[in-house]
């Protein structure tokens, strides 16, 4: 006959239950996030790769474009949930691409985050004037980027930051 374990807690959840719940919650968040497709438009292959890998690690699906023209073409065929748009790109820069996306009936509501090395107030104003939903300066603070993305994709985010 096996002796009764004095530390057994019959009917009680295991001690590691909170950790299991946290892991389950994290899996739920990643499952929810994975339905979101983010387009990263950046002519720097290194920047695009770094941002893409980080977003994929966070559970997002990611596509990339090397210039504004490609970003518009990809957005038109895939309808991403959000676009991270570098401002200084060849062929068509991020401001021009954002302007054209905002003029397109089928794309205009996609949140666009401007990503640039230019942090001046005038440059930021120009980006908001063409319709960006958020603004990040390089080097990118990845936590801030993820918080901004989460806000813009949330039901209350409505594609723009609160004033």
For each feature predicted by the language model, list its residue ranges:
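Short hydrophobic/Thr-rich beta-strand motif most characteristic of the beta2 strand and flanking loop
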Residues: 59-66, 74, 136
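Active-site beta3 strand of CheY-like receiver
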Residues: 78-84
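Receiver (REC) domain active-site loop signature in two-component systems and cognate sites
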Residues: 89
């Amino acid at each position: 006959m096996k002796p009764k374990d004095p530390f057994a807690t019959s009917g009680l959840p295991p001690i590691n239950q909170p950790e299991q719940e946290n892991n389950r919650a994290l899996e739920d968040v990643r499952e929810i996030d994975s339905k979101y497709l983010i387009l990263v438009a950046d002519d720097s292959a290194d920047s695009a790769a770094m941002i893409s890998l980080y977003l994929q690690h966070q559970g997002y699906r990611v596509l990339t474009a090397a210039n504004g023209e490609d970003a518009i073409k990809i957005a038109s065929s895939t309808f991403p949930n959000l676009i991270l748009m570098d401002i200084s790109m060849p062929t068509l820069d991020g401001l021009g691409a954002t302007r054209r996306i905002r003029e397109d009936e089928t794309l205009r509501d996609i949140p666009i985050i401007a990503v640039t090395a230019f942090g001046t107030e005038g440059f930021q104003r120009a980006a908001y004037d063409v319709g960006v939903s958020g603004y990040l300066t390089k080097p990118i603070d990845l936590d801030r980027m993820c918080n901004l993305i989460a806000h813009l994709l949330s039901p209350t985010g409505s594609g723009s930051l609160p004033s």
